[in-house]
Design a protein with these regions (language model features):
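Short coil/turn segments at secondary-structure boundaries
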Residues: 87-91, 169-174, 188-189, 203-209
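N-terminal leader/targeting and assembly helices and adjacent pre-domain segments
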Residues: 1-172, 271-326
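Acidic, metal/cofactor-coordinating or nucleic-acid-engaging core segments within structured domains
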Residues: 177
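Acidic, glycine-rich two-metal-ion catalytic cores of nucleic acid-processing enzymes
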Residues: 180-282
């Protein structure tokens, strides 16, 4: 964390963990940006090839049999690239899950100050490397759906364009609009998949440390892009039986919606609840664990805890200067 040592005693342990997790989320954003860049390279390359094939063939003058053959070949190319993106993202996210599980274990223990949280055993990490499930469906199915939707609409543009007497150039323009939409959908899927795998790692750490936890707390990234549902849930807690604590909002694991940036923080019990003699512990650790949370953890407070250089890195220098000037 980037908080100074003199700031730490003012915060509870759970508050410090929240700040550290917010730091961690920035790394998630960078990772999903890397994944999106790689996916866009694959997708854009294939889409350029489709446009070149359409232009070279002059589809507005093709006999029906040749048109059917061309469309079949192009749809096969679309299916192939989406299968490749599925394999690539699944492999990447499998490695990300392992790394995230290990980093979260280290993060929580670093903030506690000693080896407090149990690590997720390697055999459980391997068992958890199953298909990423988003809104009830495997990532593979989401990619297949996007590929099928694109192929269906692509063929529809060509066939309807011919019925309407359009020139090849007009149909290519419509296909380009479809491609822009498909790229946005692919980006959204990558962002959401990274968030889901990160949550899965958090859940694995939780299940390994139920005896020291009081529950889970929803942490939203609070800025102008925060959804209403995430604003509502920010700061709310649930016990380990998923029952709301002092509210009536039902328990739900993130991502709550496409591009969701929320997380569920693990909230530790107090030393007293754990049956630990706090007098035998370092005073800084003892005080931070049992003190109340000093402030609401949100994006604004988190940014204020960063150095100007770190603020520039997160926001970009221009936006950071504007933010610092209010």
């Amino acid at each position: 964390m980037a908080l100074s040592s003199q700031d730490k005693p003012k915060q509870s342990l759970n508050s410090r963990i929240a700040y550290a997790l917010t730091d961690r989320k920035i790394l998630h954003f960078r990772y999903d940006a890397h994944l999106r860049q790689q996916v866009m390279k694959q997708l854009s390359k294939t889409q350029r090839e489709l446009l070149n094939r359409l232009a070279a063939a002059g589809v507005d003058a093709l006999p029906k049999k040749q048109l059917d053959t061309l469309l079949k070949e192009l749809k096969q190319e679309v299916a192939k690239v989406y299968q490749e993106m599925t394999a690539y993202t699944q492999d990447e996210l499998s490695g990300f899950f392992t790394a995230e599980t290990q980093h979260l274990h280290q993060l929580y223990n670093d903030e506690v100050g000693f080896d407090f949280f149990n690590q997720v055993p390697e055999y459980k990490q391997k068992a958890n490397k199953t298909a990423t499930i988003i809104a009830g469906s495997p990532l593979e199915d989401w990619w297949a759906k996007q590929g099928n939707d694109f192929a269906f609409k692509f063929e529809g543009i060509i066939r309807q364009g011919l019925l309407d007497g359009q020139q090849t150039s007009q149909m290519i323009t419509d296909v380009k609009h479809l491609m822009n939409t498909s790229r946005r959908h692919a980006e959204t899927l990558v962002i959401t998949a990274v968030a889901k795998v990160a949550d899965k790692a958090h859940q694995a750490l939780r299940d390994e440390n139920l005896d020291i936890l009081a529950g889970e707390k929803h942490l939203s990234t609070l800025d102008t892009r925060t959804s209403t549902v995430c604003q509502l849930r920010d700061g709310l807690m649930w016990d380990l039986d998923k029952k709301p604590i002092d509210h009536d909002v039902p328990y739900q694991r993130p991502p709550l919606h496409p591009r969701c940036r929320s997380i569920l923080q693990l909230v530790t019990k107090s030393w007293k609840e754990l049956g630990i003699d706090a007098e035998e512990m370092p005073s800084s650790t003892r005080a931070s664990q049992d003190s109340p949370v000093s402030e609401q953890i949100n994006y604004e407070n988190w940014l204020k805890s960063k150095s100007p250089e770190q603020q520039d890195q997160v926001l970009g220098k221009g936006k950071a200067d504007l933010w610092r000037r209010g």
